[in-house]
Regions:
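Rossmann-like NAD(P) dinucleotide-binding subdomain of oxidoreductase/dehydrogenase enzymes
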Residues: 1-83, 101-108
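Catalytic cores of nucleotide-enabled group-transfer and carboxylate-activating enzymes in metabolic
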Residues: 22, 70-71, 80-84, 88, ...
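Acidic/polar loop patches that form or flank catalytic/metal-binding clefts of enzymes
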Residues: 3-8, 31, 53-56, 90, ...
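Generic recognition of flexible, low-complexity loop/linker segments
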Residues: 16-18, 53, 87-89, 139-140, ...
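NAD(P)-dependent aldehyde/semialdehyde dehydrogenase
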Residues: 105-176
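Extended low-complexity, polyampholyte segments enriched in Ser/Thr/Pro and acidic residues
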Residues: 92-94
């Protein structure tokens, strides 16, 4: 890449992002992440003396449909692939799957059991920002308060800041 071009900046706060968006050298911003973060970037960019465009994908949840024939043949491999896919980048990629939709069956039960086993073997990785980590944990707490949702992964204690616990939860289509 040419000098001065980058695709990602990590920091412990929002100061780097604010400086970047406000820099007169920056002519546009691309962002993938939360609605709150994207909106903050948009607001900064629009308040500049010479406003700049913001290209943002914010707050997506990507569904995955798993059909019975595929599940019957490849439940173990699908579970392994899905576990890797949802944990890559600490789950922060815009293309990460977010929800599985399938029919209830013995094969689906085998898939879920294997998924939990696979995900519990993957070490947590650092999230991009403390606010993302905090929002993730607040979301988990909110989900735990819903009696229709059951958490399938075991409780673990992670002491590293910004390293989230991997969680698989279940809710029926009727209750969703």
């Amino acid at each position: 890449m040419p000098n001065g071009v980058f695709s990602n900046l990590n920091s412990k706060g929002i100061e780097v992002g604010i400086k970047l968006v406000n820099s007169h050298h920056v002519k546009a911003v691309g962002f993938t992440g939360s609605l709150k973060g994207g909106r903050a970037i948009y607001d900064l960019a629009s308040k500049r003396i010479h406003p700049i465009p913001v290209f943002a994908e914010m707050g997506s949840v990507n569904p995955v449909l798993i059909f019975p024939k595929k599940l019957k043949k490849e439940y173990a491999e699908l579970a392994k692939q899905y576990a890797k896919s949802i944990t890559v980048g600490s789950g922060q990629f815009c293309t990460n799957p977010g929800i599985i939709i399938s029919f209830e069956s013995d094969d689906f039960d085998l898939f879920i059991k294997r998924l939990v086993e696979e995900i519990e073997q993957i070490s947590p990785s650092c999230m991009l920002h403390p606010n993302i980590y905090n929002a993730y944990n607040l979301g988990l707490e909110k989900i735990k308060q819903n009696s229709n949702v059951s958490e399938l992964t075991r409780e673990i204690n992670i002491t590293d800041k910004n390293y989230p616990k991997h969680v698989i939860s279940h809710v029926s289509a009727e209750k969703f």
